[in-house]
């Protein structure tokens, strides 16, 4: 299952979460996102990591393109985002 893994700095986590992520300007469900996870650094609560899970690689690639276009907008107000498509090879609960 392909996952789009994103990392970036935000000015303020709570504001970013409410006004950017929760507002969902990219239409996650319509774009094929099946699940998301948000994490942040314990040392820097404004450094976020997001994982968007898809059924297919083409869906993940299309979302990657949408996000690159969104990040070009100065209103995005996020610092140097990085994103890559990964695949989960193993997960086990203990």
Language model feature labels by segment:
Residues 12-35, 68-74:
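Short amphipathic alpha-helical segments
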Residues 1-11, 55-57, 71, 75-87:
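Long, low-complexity, intrinsically disordered polar/charged segments
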Residues 31-49, 72-94:
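Glycine-rich beta-strand-turn "strand-cap" elements at beta-sheet edges
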Residues 6, 21-23, 50-52, 58, ...:
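Intrinsic disorder/low-complexity signal
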């Amino acid at each position: 299952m392909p996952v789009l893994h994103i990392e970036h700095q935000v000015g303020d986590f709570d504001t970013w979460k409410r006004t950017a992520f929760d507002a969902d300007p990219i239409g996650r469900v319509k774009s094929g996102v099946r699940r998301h996870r948000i994490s942040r650094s314990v040392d820097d609560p404004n450094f976020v990591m997001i994982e968007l899970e898809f059924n297919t690689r083409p869906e993940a690639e299309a979302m990657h393109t949408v996000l690159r276009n969104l990040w070009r907008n100065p209103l995005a107000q996020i610092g140097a985002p990085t994103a890559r498509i990964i695949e989960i090879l193993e997960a086990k609960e203990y």
